[in-house]
Amino acid sequence: MDLEAKVKKMGLGHEQGFGAPCLKCKEKCEGFELHFWRKICRNCKCGQEEHDVLLSSEEDRKVGKLFEDTKYTTLIAKLKSDGIPMYKRNVMILTNPVPAKKNVSINTVTYEWAPPVQNQALARQYMQMLPKEKQPVAGSEGAQYRKKQLAKQLPEHDQDPSKCHELSPKEVKEMEQFVKKYKNEALGVGDVKLPSEMDAQAPNRICIPGGDRSTTAAVGAMEAKSGEHRRTQYSCYGCKLSMKEGDPAVYAERAGYNKLWHPACFICSTCCELLVDMIYFWKNGKLYCGRHYCDSEKPRCAGCDELIFSNEYTQAENQNWHLKHFCCFDCDNILAGEIYVMVNEKPVCKPCYVKNHAVVCQGCHNAIDPEVQRVTYNNFSWHASTECFLCSCCSKCLIGQKFMPVEGMVFCSVECKKMMS
């Protein structure tokens, strides 16, 4: 398929998750409706990951595509119908022992993902070392956390040009080259083993108590000198604390097998969240999730959340924007050359600010223009004018004067306050 055909085929899948309730806004949201080019709900402005959207098959397709053409093809399977790679995530079902009684159902726990190791006891131990609220037990807070992190850490528009908004053929080609590069140089999947099992991969590795966490040395000479076998001590590359030899450790092949992490320490160095399904990106001695690795390589548009492959883009408010996406967050009108106000780190045009966000003056009860000076006390505001910031009793102008606030009213003196009480 040529580039022109690829560009024409692109779309954002606006029916996906349509009407799903927002877990954050509850009844305030009418249901999920994807914005035309922003990756948010048009109704409540929250992301799709904040909505109760059933996306297990879609997420498996996304991760499957990520692993396509990599050394991790054993983690995917291609559907016979369309050849699309699907992620073969390891689901673990544990049966808890219960007293043998009649009419008692078996107590089972299903993990929506577990490390793909043959030793189920090791996988179970790995799970127990994660914070309880992050253990992906089906139907739990942890399962919701995993789903949210899959969407956040591995956005499909960071790997698939067809999920982006109106890329040019040149941008499509650049993105494909970028994806190929990070698959070859940075992408990896953690491996869970006991620390002692890794001695075969790193036979000359020792950790000296009180020394550097990844100190290496030739053991043979030391043992010949001392004549004693010294027990290896292991420390976590993340928290630097010691690790128990019988506890599972996470290894990252791209980092080298002289580094290991506690399960709960295998996190992105930027957002500090658990690396979902142990999928990591390695760069300059640090672990990253997919999103923050890409952020370290390319500018990201604060409007559409996509990486910017164009040579021309704008910077405003310490953020990057596609030229066509520097728009009002409320009405989508382009803001180039226009007055705007930042509301929750999002640009809003002046008319929308006055209509939807401006505070109301306690004096005249009109919205306060963003360019006009105002007086604010607690949650109350006034125009900083002789017509509005007045004593609620005698109408004396209080600009530059001491005043007594009482439930949205202001007084110039105790006498005036008593007269209004």
Swiss-Prot record:
Keywords attached to this entry: Cell junction, Cytoplasm, LIM domain, Metal-binding, Repeat, Zinc
Highest taxon listed in the record's lineage: Eukaryota
UniProt remark on domains: The N-terminal and the C-terminal halves of the protein can associate with each other, thereby hindering interactions with ZYX.
Record-level Gene Ontology MF annotations: zinc ion binding
Family: Belongs to the prickle / espinas / testin family.
Residue ranges, annotated region (Disordered): 135-165
Subunit structure: Interacts via LIM domain 1 with ZYX. Interacts (via LIM domain 3) with ENAH and VASP. Interacts with ALKBH4, talin, actin, alpha-actinin, GRIP1 and PXN. Interacts (via LIM domain 2) with ACTL7A (via N-terminus). Heterodimer with ACTL7A; the heterodimer interacts with ENAH to form a heterotrimer.
Basic and acidic residues biased stretches: 154-165
GO annotation terms (biological process): negative regulation of cell population proliferation
Secretion signal, residue range per the UniProt entry: none
GO cellular component: cytoplasm; cytosol; focal adhesion; plasma membrane; protein-containing complex
Entry function: Scaffold protein that may play a role in cell adhesion, cell spreading and in the reorganization of the actin cytoskeleton. Plays a role in the regulation of cell proliferation. May act as a tumor suppressor.
Subcellular location: Cytoplasm; Cell junction, Focal adhesion
PANTHER family in alphabetical order: LIM DOMAIN-CONTAINING PROTEIN, TESTIN
Protein's name according to its UniProt entry: Testin
Entries under Pfam families matching the protein: LIM, PET
Segments forming domain LIM zinc-binding: 234-297, 299-359, 362-421
Gene3D superfamilies: Cysteine Rich Protein (2.10.110.10)
Main location: cytoplasm
InterPro entries: LIM1_Testin (IPR034958), LIM2_Testin (IPR034959), LIM3_Testin (IPR034960), PET_domain (IPR010442), PET_testin (IPR033724), Pk/Esn/Tes (IPR047120), Znf_LIM (IPR001781)
Annotated PET domain residues: 92-199
